[in-house]
């Protein structure tokens, strides 16, 4: 959004959340979806994931500053890496679970938490990462549910219905 107004010198992250236990790291921005009610595709930039190295550097700065929990955030967190996956074979895709694994391997006494995520992005790979790092990755998942009615979800142009939502909850 800032680039639309000629602002190109945008900070890559925050150095601290002074006096706070929890810090927030935005790992992606934008959204590919066009839900009927949503203005985000019109006011946010196209889907863009931050480079892994930048995120790792920011997490290190924050944990070195004493933050004990880092919350990964994004407009559509589950789409982290999707912008890099075009024209790549599926086995070479970058996913949110890859980012989580890299961050969980960093040294230090801190935990990783995921902010809100879509039910369709609760993948077996993400669940496996949660299982692999139970002491590092907070066992908390905030799934978005705008309606419990399939007809309302269709009118909203959501990519899933109540059955898929419940199936993903059962996976957890």
Each model region followed by its residue ranges:
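Conserved SAM/AdoMet-binding glycine-rich loop
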Residues: 64-172
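Proteins enriched for Cys/Gly/acidic motifs involved in redox and nucleic-acid/cofactor modification
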Residues: 1-83, 163-171
């Amino acid at each position: 959004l800032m680039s639309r107004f000629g602002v190109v010198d945008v900070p890559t992250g925050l150095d601290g959340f002074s006096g706070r236990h929890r810090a927030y790291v935005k790992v992606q921005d934008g959204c590919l979806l066009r839900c009927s009610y949503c203005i985000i595709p019109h006011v946010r930039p196209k889907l863009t994931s931050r480079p892994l190295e930048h995120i790792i550097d920011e997490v290190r700065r924050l944990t070195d500053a004493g933050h004990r929990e880092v919350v990964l955030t994004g407009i559509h967190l589950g789409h982290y890496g999707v912008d890099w996956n075009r024209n790549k074979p599926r086995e070479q895709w970058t996913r949110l679970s890859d980012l989580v694994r890299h961050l969980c391997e960093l040294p230090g006494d801190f935990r990783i938490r995921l902010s809100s995520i879509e039910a369709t992005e609760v993948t077996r790979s993400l669940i496996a990462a949660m299982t692999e790092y139970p002491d590092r990755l907070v066992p908390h998942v905030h799934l978005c549910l705008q309606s419990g009615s399939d007809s309302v979800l269709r009118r909203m142009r959501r990519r899933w219905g109540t059955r898929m939502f419940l199936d993903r909850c059962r996976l957890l």
